[in-house]
Swiss-Prot record:
Source species, domain of life: Eukaryota
Organism: Saccharomyces cerevisiae (strain ATCC 204508 / S288c) (Baker's yeast)
This protein's name: Putative uncharacterized protein YLR466C-B
Amino acid sequence: MSLRPCLTPSSMQYSDIYIPTHSLTSTSTLAVIPYPAF
């Protein structure tokens, strides 16, 4: 069992909540520190 699922129902909801919420901070962070978004 991998810690980060690629295409799973759980991943869909997780990214749906994680991306919009973290995107606010990630947007400015990505410009400074490009890290792999899970």
